[in-house]
């Protein structure tokens, strides 16, 4: 298992390259300005809805593999991480609220695990992820918003919302496309629409394209090499212990 000291050093390396480090807000969500349009216009989500997720590893640059207690099995937080990715990439979302929703999802997921040790292991990455989020800058979020929002005249915004939700249902749940207009009618503001679209993404995860995080592959390689070296060292120690004094 990776030592706590090694984890801390790795964390400091990541922190040291982040230009947005702020001691006063250490561990607090980064506040980024929501996407805005020119006066007389509102942002609405572009179609097709394009969301990609690298899972939990993307939030920590592949460092999830180094978290103490991390097993090789399925990550119980993975759905929460995919939901966070969808939230950040949805037009009109608010970055720190996406992080808050992720923490609530993670805490509820870990609390629902019956085995105390497994529940504790599940919770360990949450605080690290919270710190990493506070060190993050707004660039990635801003890029997502620019890519996935389009500005339309205010009197056309609601029509565009209805059109988006209708297309979403046509693609991911055509049997219930009749719900689209009613749901869109409730999402009559930028924030409400972002909330609706994020909920749709969570309910219909096929709309999220899962991709591999290159940083995770790199960290997995480091962990594998470290474990192999430890096994070799243990074998050498065992061989040395087997050498009795009578053989000298």
Q: What do these predicted regions represent?
A:
Residues 3-19:
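Cleavable N-terminal signal peptides of Sec/SRP-targeted secreted and luminal proteins
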Residues 18-248:
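Extended terminal accessory/targeting regions
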């Amino acid at each position: 298992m990776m030592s706590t000291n090694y984890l801390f050093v790795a964390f400091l390396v990541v922190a040291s390259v982040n230009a947005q480090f702020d001691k006063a807000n250490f561990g607090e969500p980064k506040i980024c300005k929501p996407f805005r349009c020119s006066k007389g216009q509102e942002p609405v989500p572009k179609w097709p809805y394009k969301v990609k997720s690298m899972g939990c590893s993307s939030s920590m640059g592949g460092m999830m593999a180094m978290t103490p207690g991390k097993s090789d099995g399925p990550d119980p937080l993975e759905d929460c991480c995919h939901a966070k990715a969808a939230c950040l990439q949805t037009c009109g979302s608010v970055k720190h609220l996406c992080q808050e929703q992720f923490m609530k999802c993670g805490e509820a997921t870990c609390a629902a695990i019956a085995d105390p040790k497994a529940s504790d292991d599940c919770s360990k990455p949450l605080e690290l992820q919270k710190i990493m989020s506070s060190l993050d800058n707004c660039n990635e979020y801003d890029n997502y918003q620019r890519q996935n929002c389009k500005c339309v005249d205010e009197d056309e915004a609601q029509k565009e919302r209805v059109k988006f939700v209708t297309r979403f249902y046509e693609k991911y749940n055509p049997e219930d496309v009749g719900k689209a207009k009613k749901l869109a009618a409730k999402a009559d503001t930028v924030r409400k629409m972002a909330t609706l679209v994020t909920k749709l993404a969570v309910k219909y995860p096929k709309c999220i394209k899962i991709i591999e995080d290159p940083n995770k592959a790199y960290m997995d390689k480091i962990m594998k090499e470290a474990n192999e070296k430890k096994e070799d060292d243990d074998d050498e120690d065992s061989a040395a212990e087997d050498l009795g004094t009578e053989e000298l």
